[in-house]
Amino acid sequence: MKYQLTALEARVIGCLLEKQVTTPEQYPLSVNGVVTACNQKTNREPVMNLSESEVQEQLDNLVKRHYLRTVSGFGNRVTKYEQRFCNSEFGDLKLSAAEVALITTLLLRGAQTPGELRSRAARMYEFSDMAEVELTLEQLANREDGPFVVRLAREPGKRESRYMHLFSGEVEDQPAVTDMSNAVDGDLQARVEALEIEVAELKQRLDSLLAHLGD
């Protein structure tokens, strides 16, 4: 594949894709906005603690590779960034809303089951049922310009196989973990995490509104 993103590049692009859909009033993002999104504790695996300089380096690299572009002027006091990774005017990668939601969630959290993906991607796209999730994953795995996802071997204690994106190269299956704590129902855990994410997004919007009113 022509896409070879590092872990940090995947995090930055995933954040911009996410915020473009979930908080369009705050998009494009400033450097500080990208830092906050990258280090967010909800809907991130692993949780990171990136500095502004580390994030700026990734942004500069991604702009050079034409995956992002800068937006300035027209009243913007600071440079902001928007993604050109997919669905851009002159870009080759075209994804449906359902595909964007799944790819974004995989970029932000790594390998996940269809049930986990359905719950965690719900803020970006509301899948009608599990069949739609599985069909979308199958389409991503079999695209002529792909594949963009791969199904991994099922882990012990899990009802579903996990899927992983291929924008960072081929994926090696992780060794099976036999700890019974890993057999917890992933769907329930994902639903709890989805609620936590929704609360965090609402708090972020409230803080932004209060800051705007205070100006």
Swiss-Prot record:
Record InterPro entries: DUF480, WH-like_DNA-bd_sf, WH_DNA-bd_sf
N6-acetyllysine sites (modified residues): K80
Annotated keywords: Acetylation
Family note: Belongs to the UPF0502 family.
PANTHER family, alphabetized: UPF0502 PROTEIN YCEH
Entry protein name: UPF0502 protein YceH
Source organism: Escherichia coli O157:H7
